[in-house]
Regions:
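Flexible helix-coil transition and linker loops at the boundaries of alpha-helical arrays
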Residues: 1, 35-67, 97-102, 135-141
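Helix-rich alpha-solenoid scaffolding regions
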Residues: 1-18
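Generic helix N-cap/helix-start motif at coil->alpha-helix transitions
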Residues: 2-6, 65-74, 101-109, 139-148, ...
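Amphipathic alpha-helical repeat scaffolds
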Residues: 12, 75-79, 95, 114, ...
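Extended, low-complexity alpha-biased scaffolding regions
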Residues: 50-62, 69, 86, 121, ...
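Structured C-terminal portions of repeat-based eukaryotic scaffold domains
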Residues: 126-262
């Protein structure tokens, strides 16, 4: 008997090797299995479709388990669709998950709003971000930083980088160790011509907590900032490369540094 988590991992692995279509095929096959088992249980049969007797409690527990597994597969398919930049497929899956997994609605609306921005639909993004607030826990239990990030994303989509920087400055004061805030705040500072401030912000985070902040997106943006700041960018990139070697190893895609042969 192969554990479900292992089957899901096997289905996801091709995505990490750049074989997204193969991953989607495997994940969809796994989703069909989940759907068939749920259908069998709803029709009064056992999981495998036989007439094996099950108590009501056993059936309810099994349905709950397989619905949860179905959601896990749908989340994986969504991630794969985003990697393929198939934002419409990802959006339709998230909308289905909102209906089926209402406890996760706030986070799902946040993700859906970001997808709307990827599609260039700022109005839909704003409406979706409003849904995030409606489904979040009431103050003081919800995270105010997430709402500020949403506002900043909308400003960035409208090329209002100065406004976005001001919003992200507020978010940074609330949570100075939030990687999304640091990365986006740095980018906005860069686009408003405050490159030195952007470098100080992002570089400070990377060197103070490399295990936490050495992400490819952050490193890529930092490399761009170095290139804009001075002709000494290569040496600074090498310092980041050394940090990556110490804390991340071979799994890190060093192409993010944009190193050129000297």
């Amino acid at each position: 008997m192969v554990p479900f988590g292992f089957r899901l991992l096997v289905a996801e692995l091709p995505q990490h090797l750049g074989k997204h279509t193969q991953a989607l095929d495997r994940l969809n096959a796994l989703l069909r299995t989940c759907n068939q088992i749920i259908k069998n249980l709803n029709n009064g049969l056992s999981e495998d479709g036989s007439n094996l007797e099950m108590t009501n409690n056993m059936r309810d527990d099994s349905l709950k388990l397989w619905r949860t597994r179905r959601h896990r597969v749908m989340y994986s398919i969504t991630n794969c669709a985003v990697s393929l930049k198939d934002f419409r497929l990802a959006g339709s899956l998230i909308e289905r998950l909102i209906q089926e997994d209402p406890n996760s609605a706030a986070g799902l609306y946040s993700a859906l709003g970001r997808l709307c921005l990827q599609l260039g639909d700022v109005t839909a993004a704003q409406e979706t971000f409003n849904q995030y607030f409606e489904h979040s826990l009431p103050p003081p239990h919800h995270d105010p930083v997430q709402g500020l990030l949403h506002s900043a994303y909308v400003s960035i989509a409208q090329n209002a980088f100065k406004d976005a920087a001001e919003i992200l400055q507020q978010a940074h004061k609330i949570n100075p160790s939030n990687g999304l805030v640091i990365n986006n705040y740095g980018v906005c500072l860069m686009y408003t011509g405050r490159v030195s401030e952007a470098i100080a912000l992002v570089e400070g985070a990377v060197f103070s907590q490399p295990e936490r902040f050495l992400h490819e997106a952050i490193v890529l943006n930092l490399a761009t900032m170095y290139e804009l700041e001075s002709s000494n960018a290569h040496q600074k990139k090498l310092k980041i490369l050394s940090l990556i070697a110490q804390h991340k190893g071979d799994s890190f895609n060093v192409a993010a540094l944009k190193l050129q042969p000297q």
